[in-house]
Amino acid sequence: MSGLFITFEGGEGAGKSTQIALLASHLRNHGFDPVITREPGGSPGAEAIRHVILSGNAETYGPAMEALLFAAARADHVDQLIRPTLAEGRIVLCDRFIDSSRAYQGVTGNLDATYMAAIERIAIDGAMPDLTLVLDICAERGLSRAGKRRGSDTADRFEKEDIAVHEARRQAFLEIARQEPARCKVIDADRSQEKIADEIRSVVDTILTEKGLL
């Protein structure tokens, strides 16, 4: 894979989709043609599974089987979109990827790390992100933002969970970043959109320069 694979991680209301859009605009201004995608979803098969997961219907299967659903969606996403796009030398910007599974199913789902690592390995088949931007914000602030963004729409099953669960996921993302500093960059998301975007652009531009692409 010769392109650049960038993932955005963080809790509810961290501003991932906003920052992905701003980074995509920045990249287009520099002549790149980035592909924006998301998880769960990103391919027809994965989008079908997304509906099952976010509706809450998958909860009846239990955490272990739900993790397999996420893995199945991810495998299809990687095969149908991510890997072919990277093979074209393009940039992929993905809203959530493996670290969300580690935090959501692995940590707060209390699943064994060996089990999670095994299904992750099968699902991505070597398609690791080149850069993961962890947008960090305290759970209370993030949920408040998510509620304002949602308006009168119904909260999905994850937003409805207890604030302690959201904070545990936040800490899980931060721990992943501590363990994998070469891949992960923590971004303070409790700032203005412009300041966050400036830092993200700086990080990405540095990588593009190092690769001789900018």
From Swiss-Prot:
Q: Name one Pfam family in it.
A: Thymidylate_kin
Q: Which UniProt keywords apply?
A: ATP-binding, Kinase, Nucleotide biosynthesis, Nucleotide-binding, Transferase
The residues that hold ATP are 10-17
Sorted alphabetically, which CDD domains does this protein's record hold? TMPK
Disulfide bridges in this chain: none
Q: Which GO terms describe its cellular component?
A: cytosol
The EC number(s) given in the record are: 2.7.4.9
Gene Ontology MF, one: ATP binding
* Top-level taxon in the UniProt lineage: Bacteria
User: What's a GO biological-process term for it?
Assistant: dUDP biosynthetic process
Which catalysed reactions does the entry list for this protein?
Answer: dTMP + ATP = dTDP + ADP
Q: What does this protein do?
A: Phosphorylation of dTMP to form dTDP in both de novo and salvage pathways of dTTP synthesis.
Q: Which family does it belong to?
A: Belongs to the thymidylate kinase family.
> What HAMAP family does the record tag this protein with?
Thymidylate_kinase
Q: What is this protein called?
A: Thymidylate kinase
The organism's lineage? Bacteria, Pseudomonadati, Pseudomonadota, Alphaproteobacteria, Hyphomicrobiales
